[in-house]
Amino acid sequence: GDCFFKQVFNLIVEYIDSQPKYFVHRDYHSRNLMYPMESGMPGILDFQDAVHGPVSYDLVSLLKDAYIEWDEDVILDQAARYWEEARKVGLISNLDFSDFYKQFEFTGVQRHLKILGIFSRLSIRDKKNQYLENIPLIEKYLLSTTERYKELHPLRKILDKALLK
């Protein structure tokens, strides 16, 4: 029970903590991006909570967005492109793509658990029920990732019970 839960969370923290750190928006998703401005650059909103964080965090926020679902092949392709560019500019070194993608996925688990909590709080405390419609996509991300990695299976079992699936 609790022991497995703690082990899984410690593992998730290890994967997040092992990543190179740089500027992270922390809320980099579709609803915080504006169509390209006159300059041709997109407008980026809600950046006041930016921090120094794991290199894959904003990528997870964008590719496993709470509001838009991308096909898995698109996610893999874009993650690979990001990894290649990050290596070229020196953000990532000595890390093959499969290791980077695992870090990306574990970072996603942390982010998606946080989002489930935030959306639930917004509904229960603030009566903002519109976020509930996005929970199934977040659950889908969590269930597929926790199924894919053996180390996350204990969390998957907890999620199965909690989500009544």
Predicted feature locations:
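Histidine/acidic-rich helix-loop-helix segments that form or flank divalent-metal centers
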Residues: 93-102
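ATP/Mg2+ or Mg2+-diphosphate-binding catalytic cores
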Residues: 117-165
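Active-site activation/catalytic loop segments of kinase-like enzymes and analogous catalytic loops
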Residues: 56-92, 106-125, 138-145
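Activation segment
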Residues: 36, 42, 50-52, 68
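Amphipathic, non-membrane alpha-helical segments in soluble helical-bundle scaffolds
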Residues: 49, 72, 102-109, 128, ...
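Hydrophobic packing residues in well-ordered alpha-helices of helical domains and bundles
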Residues: 2-5, 75, 109, 131-135, ...
